[in-house]
């Protein structure tokens, strides 16, 4: 029997009475109280998440930008220091190995954040793809903890935490840092990366610290947030990201799925100079018959789930990739890959929910946008 990996905050989660689940070989908190309560807490106030199972890969050296331009679909060399970019790691055939956020750090290095399920694969791919360049690829996953604070009061809580700490970070700069930008500094003697990024559809921060500082950072944030900050597990993170129309690897993304199918054609930069992995395959691919990702909404309380068939006039035209009864909106929502001729906004389709037809309508993503 394989022993599950534990994050640096495992003891904290146990003390809070969390329920755990196996996620990509990690023993992760799935919930602390209830999925709904945690979901609503993030939409109304703020939630705190342990995301230390994610992978962190540092790319350093004079050719870092060029190496990432070759390894990834985006033009990372054009990303200014202190900014971040969402990009894709592709196969030679143009399928998606992983979707990633890459930070161009103020010191000139790049930090690539990989999904937990793909961290080892991603590391191997970056090591192989960067071998021709003058760079160093370093796996910092085991030494790094990641804590996210997300929700309407996230900014207030993080600023309050900074005021309680001995830090080189400027509170005004942290407050004003824009979406997909980051700052570095020290927090009570530990290095910290503060990024205005997230996976919930809400405002907030993701904070990276050494693993040994994880419990200290968590408690600092909890003390600052008080009743306005709720510990949140992976269950509500999934419902939050689905409402926000954000893809999840293994559901909306995979090596058999190409970027344009998932609505991510914009992420692939064909204008950048030189080759990149997957370029030739995508440039020569006929996409006219590819199924495409759409949003579906329905009425009532029954929700389609991953794998359920999408039907049009008694013909199966697709399948759901993720589906829930939306806690925020109060009706069923789903993302699905469907045939292109039924993907137009406003098209009526049905979902086979255990032998019963759920009437749905194709809608624009995301389902939820914060005001």
Swiss-Prot record:
Q: Which reaction does it catalyse?
A: N(6)-[(R)-S(8)-aminomethyldihydrolipoyl]-L-lysyl-[protein] + (6S)-5,6,7,8-tetrahydrofolate = N(6)-[(R)-dihydrolipoyl]-L-lysyl-[protein] + (6R)-5,10-methylene-5,6,7,8-tetrahydrofolate + NH4(+)
Question: Keywords in UniProt for this one?
Answer: Aminotransferase, Transferase
Q: What is its EC number?
A: 2.1.2.10
Q: Which GO terms describe its biological process?
A: glycine decarboxylation via glycine cleavage system
GO molecular function annotations of the record:
aminomethyltransferase activity; transaminase activity
Question: For this UniProt entry, what's an example GO CC term?
Answer: cytosol
Q: Which family does it belong to?
A: Belongs to the GcvT family.
Q: Which HAMAP family match?
A: GcvT
Function recorded in the entry: The glycine cleavage system catalyzes the degradation of glycine.
SUBUNIT field: The glycine cleavage system is composed of four proteins: P, T, L and H.
Protein known as: Aminomethyltransferase
- Gene source species: Cutibacterium acnes (strain DSM 16379 / KPA171202)
């Amino acid at each position: 029997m394989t022993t599950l990996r534990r994050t640096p905050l495992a003891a904290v989660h146990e003390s809070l009475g969390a329920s755990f689940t196996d996620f990509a070989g990690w023993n992760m908190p799935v919930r602390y109280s209830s999925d709904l309560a945690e979901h609503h807490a993030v939409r109304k106030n703020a939630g705190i998440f342990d995301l230390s199972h994610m992978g962190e890969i540092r790319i350093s050296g004079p050719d870092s930008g060029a190496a990432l331009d070759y390894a990834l679909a985006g033009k990372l060399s054009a990303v200014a220091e202190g900014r971040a970019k969402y990009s894709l790691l592709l196969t030679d055939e143009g399928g998606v190995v992983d979707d990633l956020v890459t930070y161009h750090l103020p010191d000139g290095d790049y930090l690539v954040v990989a999904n937990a399920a793909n961290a080892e694969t991603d590391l191997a791919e970056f090591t192989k793809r960067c071998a021709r360049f003058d760079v160093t690829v370093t796996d910092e996953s085991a030494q790094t903890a990641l804590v996210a604070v997300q929700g309407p009061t996230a900014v207030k809580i993080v600023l309050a935490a900074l005021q309680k700490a001995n830090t080189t970070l400027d509170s005004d700069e942290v407050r004003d840092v824009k979406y997909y930008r980051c700052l570095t500094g020290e927090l009570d003697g530990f290095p910290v990366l503060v990024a205005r990024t997230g996976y919930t559809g809400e405002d907030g921060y993701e904070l990276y610290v050494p693993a040994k500082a994880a419990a200290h950072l968590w408690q600092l944030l909890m003390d600052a947030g008080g009743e306005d900050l709720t510990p949140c597990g992976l269950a509500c993170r999934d419902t939050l990201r689905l409402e926000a129309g954000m893809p999840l690897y293994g559901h909306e993304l995979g090596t058999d799925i190409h970027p344009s199918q998932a609505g991510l054609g914009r992420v692939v930069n064909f204008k950048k100079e030189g080759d990149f992995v997957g370029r030739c395959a995508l440039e020569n691919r006929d996409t006219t018959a590819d199924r495409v990702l759409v949003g579906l909404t329905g009425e009532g309380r029954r929700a389609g789930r991953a794998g359920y068939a999408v039907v049009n006039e008694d013909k199966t035209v697709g399948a759901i990739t993720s589906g829930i009864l939306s806690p925020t909106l109060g009706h069923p929502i789903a993302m699905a890959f469907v045939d292109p001729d039924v993907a137009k906004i406003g098209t009526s389709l049905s979902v086979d929910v255990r032998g019963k037809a759920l009437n749905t309508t194709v809608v624009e993503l995301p389902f939820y946008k914060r005001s």
